[in-house]
């Protein structure tokens, strides 16, 4: 009997060892690349690429175009123009159920479509990405929850953002730095319009730097009223938050060092995936760029 029990125990231990070894040997089947690094902002992803932490950064085209074309910091890097990821649209988000607040944001964007919206976009080189028109329909026009009234009564609105030029960035250094950007200027214009139309006294928006991966939680617990920072609209985000109408077009792009062109530059996405098999990829955690690398959920 003891001998039989010993044999059974040996078999069980052997099976457990095989399972453990298999688990230790498991790898994530990324869409491309062998390793994925995540950081707290898209700017950090670019900086990580520059430091040599990764071979490829995946970020928003809106941001990539700005840094590649308007600064010297990344003059030795390039966008892989022929590698096409999914095209996207940006939206503004509030806590789930706060449709009345988002409705007022929509209303203002539509009203400003031919004025401030275009003027601000022109300032930051984003006129070709604009999506709102004067005849755009506000899908939340009938919303009547208390979220807008709360902002009116509090006389303040707190907006969460990350540094993400030309959407939101510091112009200048140290104490002289000024927060500017397309979304920053647009948010101010929207609140100014709403104050004028509804005779409200909401102060100029308060902008708070957030951990992008915590944006939903920060909306839910009331730390911020809005996420207004080039947020890609997805079905999951529309399910978990109240999201505005699309206001800016975007797509995800791959950034590499120009010196690595021979290694990663391809004529299409499929060719890029093959070339990037052994690459280390860096993205902002919780971003659309991360979803371009992670395997699709089954």
Task: Please place each PLM-identified region on the residue numbering.
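Positively charged n-region of N-terminal signal peptides that target proteins for export
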Residues: 1-9
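Extracytoplasmic small-molecule ligand-binding "clamshell" domains
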Residues: 35-42, 47-51, 60, 105, ...
């Amino acid at each position: 009997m003891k001998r039989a029990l010993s044999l059974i125990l040996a078999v069980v231990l052997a099976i457990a060892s095989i399972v453990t070894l298999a688990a230790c040997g498991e790898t994530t089947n990324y869409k491309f690349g062998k390793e994925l690094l995540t950081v707290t902002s898209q700017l950090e992803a670019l900086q990580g690429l520059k430091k040599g932490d990764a071979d490829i950064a995946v970020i928003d085209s809106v941001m990539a175009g700005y840094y590649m074309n308007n600064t010297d910091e990344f003059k030795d890097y390039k966008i892989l123009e022929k590698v096409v990821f999914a095209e996207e649209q940006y939206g503004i988000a509030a806590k789930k159920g706060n449709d009345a607040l988002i409705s007022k944001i929509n209303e203002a964007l539509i009203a400003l479509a031919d004025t401030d919206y275009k003027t601000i976009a022109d300032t930051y080189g984003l006129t070709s990405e604009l999506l709102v028109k004067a005849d755009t329909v506000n899908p939340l026009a009938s919303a009547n929850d208390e979220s807008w009234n709360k902002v009116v009564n509090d006389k303040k609105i707190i907006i969460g953002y990350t540094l993400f030029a030309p959407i939101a960035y510091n112009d200048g250094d140290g104490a002289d730095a000024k927060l500017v950007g397309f979304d920053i200027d647009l948010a101010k214009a929207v609140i100014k319009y709403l104050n004028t139309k509804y005779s409200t006294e909401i102060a100029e928006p308060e902008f708070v730097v957030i951990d992008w991966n915590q944006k939903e939680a920060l909306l839910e617990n009331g730390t911020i009223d809005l996420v207004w920072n080039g947020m890609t609209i997805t079905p999951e985000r529309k399910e978990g938050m109240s999201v505005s109408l699309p206001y800016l077009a975007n797509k995800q792009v791959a950034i590499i060092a120009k010196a690595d062109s021979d290694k990663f530059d391809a004529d299409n996405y499929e060719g890029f995936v093959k070339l990037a098999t052994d690459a280390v990829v860096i993205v902002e955690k919780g971003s659309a760029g991360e979803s371009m690398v992670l395997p699709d959920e089954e």
